[in-house]
């Protein structure tokens, strides 16, 4: 509500300006609205973590941050943009850098957190996820060609068309499930890296969930929602909190 209403309000004003002939002003206002939402997303991520720490108590001691997160919003903007500029290849750096910056501004009691996660430790998993669509696309072409040849040998021209379609459709499940599994493998490695690189004074944190653990979590989430006709959504936050 806080983001949506102002954004759609500015978008409506921008469209009205364009309709009245003020194209440049309307485009500028639309760009400003998009950048404002982008900035506020970064601030919101910072404040969400600060809020959770402020509600975490241990023997009367609680966490938080001395900063409001406004500068982090700017860091979120430029680091995310830089991560996407070279065809998305710097996204692991962007994600680890933002994690380090966000946690390094947090504290629990009188002691600050420290985080020094390195993107190089997760880049191999990310590169696997990044290149998989291209490999699957090439595999789809090969399978379609093989299906066309097999179909042509059985049913001529009609068989060739049918064989090509079968070859392509046979690759669709591998594309969705394979790409999804690799994405889960990347995030499993990412969280093991960033949590393991986070410290609080002399206390080092670890996160040992494997890719299989993540798959089990997501599959059970889906089954819980489907077989309870959506009622299970209310239990997902508890499951995720327990998982982490």
Predicted regions and their residues:
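Alpha-helical membrane-embedded segments
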Residues: 36-40, 84-89, 172-186, 224-236
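Juxtamembrane interface at the ends
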Residues: 45-53, 92-112, 182-202, 237-244
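Membrane-helix interface segments in multi-pass membrane proteins
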Residues: 7-37, 136-183, 237, 241-244
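Transmembrane-helix bundle segments that line or gate the permeation/cavity pathway
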Residues: 1-105
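Hydrophobic alpha-helical segments embedded in or immediately adjacent to the lipid bilayer
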Residues: 86, 90-107, 127, 132-151, ...
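Interfacial aromatic "cap" segments that immediately flank transmembrane helices
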Residues: 1-5, 61-83, 111-138, 190-231
């Amino acid at each position: 509500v806080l983001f949506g209403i102002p954004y759609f309000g500015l978008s409506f004003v921008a469209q009205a300006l364009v309709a009245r002939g003020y194209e440049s002003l309307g485009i500028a206002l639309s760009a400003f609205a998009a950048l404002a939402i982008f900035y506020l997303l970064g601030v919101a991520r910072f404040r969400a973590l600060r809020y959770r720490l402020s509600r975490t108590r241990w023997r009367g001691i609680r966490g938080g941050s001395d900063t409001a997160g406004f500068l982090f919003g700017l860091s979120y903007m430029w680091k995310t943009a830089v991560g996407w500029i070279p065809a998305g290849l710097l996204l692991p750096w962007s994600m680890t850098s933002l994690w380090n910056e966000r946690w390094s501004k947090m504290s629990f009691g009188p002691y600050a957190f420290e985080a020094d996660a390195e993107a190089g430790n997760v880049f191999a998993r990310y590169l696997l996820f990044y290149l998989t669509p291209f490999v699957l696309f090439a595999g789809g072409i090969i399978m379609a060609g093989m299906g066309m040849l097999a179909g042509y040998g059985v049913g001529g021209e009609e068989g060739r068309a049918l064989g090509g379609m079968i070859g392509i459709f046979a690759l669709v499940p591998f594309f969705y499930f394979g790409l999804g599994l690799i994405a889960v493998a990347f995030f499993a490695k990412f969280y093991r890296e960033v949590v393991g690189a986070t410290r609080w004074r002399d206390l080092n944190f670890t996160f040992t969930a494997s890719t299989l653990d993540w798959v089990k979590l997501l599959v059970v989430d889906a089954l819980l929602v489907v077989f309870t006709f959506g009622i299970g959504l209310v239990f997902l936050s508890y499951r995720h909190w327990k998982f982490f």
